[in-house]
């Protein structure tokens, strides 16, 4: 069969998806494993170079080929082992510090994404919180990381202020990457009154979401810093004055939108009574409660999380791990 006849018989889109995926795999093996050029592959298969390039691109898009960028910052097994021993963790994921917090956020969230995607057996139900760190983690999840996964949002996440960076569509992103579906909590994280929260929790739709969040065997979340950079400030739930008052009252950050002190205890009952979503103490019942945090601004809230045993898996940077090991008992 000549190249011309093969090209003429090959439609621009094969009718059979399995047939096309088999061709993607064949071309990808030649290109990546056997290191053939696209020109050589075109001659060998009877395709055009344009068709070869398109098949390689589609192979990456559907997950047949996965290109993983290995960060220069390696995991630090000696610190990980010490963290596990000291704090009774199922797993510690510690990445070398680079001095650049943006770089560290990338490598830590990438490692956390690999850990979540590698859980065996793959969890069918995963709970996630919202925020910048979780958005970043979702970006690193491999395509089809958990085919058909059900992702539920752990806390309310409707922004009451229009912000440039959308941090509240985390569940959809986790689910999309896993070819699954998301269940959202379509209410603000913090309501105007305790009575409003109680009324919403009686609504059968909201109650069902809260039940699913409680039943999820895996929870993945980031601790929030106590500063004007907090997503709770940027989203309009609290202002800088409230943050300063919380600091005076002993708050070190937030967990699932609830402000806690050095021991992980709720600091502001008047705010907590208006907050909707999974309570931090319910994290202790999860098979995998995965906390992800990077940077000095989250040192104290990470320590609070460990003290209260809200997490049994921690993904973080080297500097944070060393702080926790040196000051965990203070």
Kindly label every feature range from the protein language model.
Residues 127-128, 218:
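Short, hydrophobic/glycine-enriched beta-strand segments
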Residues 35-36, 77, 110, 132:
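A generic alpha-helix surface/boundary motif
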Residues 2-28, 32-41, 46, 51-57, ...:
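Conserved phosphate- and dinucleotide-binding cores of soluble alpha/beta proteins
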Residues 94-97, 154, 185-187:
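Conserved beta-strand termini and adjacent loop/short-helix elements that scaffold enzyme active sites
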Residues 133-144, 231-241:
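Short Gly/Thr/Asp-enriched flexible loops that form oxyanion-binding sites at enzyme active sites
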Residues 128-133, 294:
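Glycine-rich beta-strand-to-loop/alpha-helix junction loops that act as flexible
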């Amino acid at each position: 069969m000549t190249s011309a006849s093969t090209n003429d018989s090959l439609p621009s889109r094969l009718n059979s998806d399995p047939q096309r995926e088999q061709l993607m795999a064949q071309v990808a093996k030649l290109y990546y494993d056997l290191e053939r050029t696209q020109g050589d592959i075109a001659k060998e298969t009877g395709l055009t170079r344009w068709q070869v390039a398109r098949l390689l691109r589609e192979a990456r898009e559907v997950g047949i080929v996965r290109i993983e960028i290995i960060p220069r910052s390696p995991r630090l097994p000696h610190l990980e082992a010490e963290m596990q021993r000291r704090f009774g963790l199922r797993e510690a994921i510690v990445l070398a510090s680079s001095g650049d917090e943006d770089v560290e956020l990338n490598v830590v969230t990438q490692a956390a994404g690999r850990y979540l995607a590698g859980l065996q057996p793959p969890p069918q139900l995963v709970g996630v919180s919202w925020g910048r760190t979780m958005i970043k983690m979702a970006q690193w999840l491999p395509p089809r990381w958990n085919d058909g996964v059900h992702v539920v949002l752990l806390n309310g996440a409707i922004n009451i202020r229009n912000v440039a960076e959308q941090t509240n569509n985390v569940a959809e992103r986790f689910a999309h990457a896993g070819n699954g579906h998301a269940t959202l909590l379509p209410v603000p994280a913090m309501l105007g009154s305790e009575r409003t929260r109680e009324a919403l929790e009686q609504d059968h739709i909201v109650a069902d979401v809260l039940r699913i969040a409680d039943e999820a065997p895996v929870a993945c979340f980031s601790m929030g810093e106590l500063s004007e950079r907090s997503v709770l400030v940027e989203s309009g739930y609290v202002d800088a004055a409230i943050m300063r008052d919380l600091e005076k009252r002993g708050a070190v950050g937030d967990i699932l939108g609830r402000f806690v002190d050095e021991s992980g205890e709720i600091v502001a009952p008047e705010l907590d009574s208006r907050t909707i979503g999974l309570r931090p103490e319910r994290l202790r019942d999860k098979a995998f409660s995965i906390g992800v945090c990077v940077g000095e601004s989250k040192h104290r809230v990470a320590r609070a999380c460990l003290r209260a045993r809200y997490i049994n898996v921690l993904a973080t940077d080297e500097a944070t791990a060393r702080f926790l090991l040196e000051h965990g008992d203070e």
